Amino acid sequence: MARKKVDKPVKEMLVIFVEGDADEIIINRLLDHYRSNGWKYESDIKLKNTHGFPDEKKIKAYLTTIIETMSEKIIKFKAVCCEYDTDVFEKGTKQRPDWEKIGNNLRDNYGVNEFCRIEAKTSIEDWMLDDSEGLLKVLHLPLNTNIKGMSGQDKVKSLFRKKNIMYDRSKGKSTIKKYLDNLDISKIANNRKVELKDFENILGVKNNDE
């Protein structure tokens, strides 16, 4: 007697790629901020820190790993989002990827329903400085401290340096997390609405001004 075919359960998933530890902390805090304001997401969310620019090769490798390690289920990628700093493109040190082509490839090869980019302009440190007062407070620096630096990253590094703390945005989670966790994330969410628009649309976040 033929064995009855058992259909695999379907697991829907949103995958978010970030390029460093600081980015991972901030994006996770944004998700918590949305949840605290009543947002719910029915599918699983996986956040992958690629410790470097989340290019197509890294994206595909991780999606493949998910499929292979969860082979007992049918994985449906509701969306894939990539977060990265824009400074490398603005400086001309890196060529902009063909994001439309990447999105189409992910759709064709992995069934990704939606693809979006979260561009941190000019860097995730610029986002952090949206609450410069909070950063000064958590570092126990005077609120009138002159924040020096040519870029957001330089400015944040200089503030941590004043307290003899090594700021490593890529692999320094154990050191920087307690400081970034004390920033007022609502200031970032409100000040970066343009950069977060597509991300929030995919998440289904409802804004008070809508």
Protein language model features and the residues they cover:
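Short hydrophobic beta-strand that contains or immediately precedes a catalytic carboxylate
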Residues: 16-18
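Charged, often glycine-rich, active-site loop that binds/positions anionic groups
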Residues: 51-63
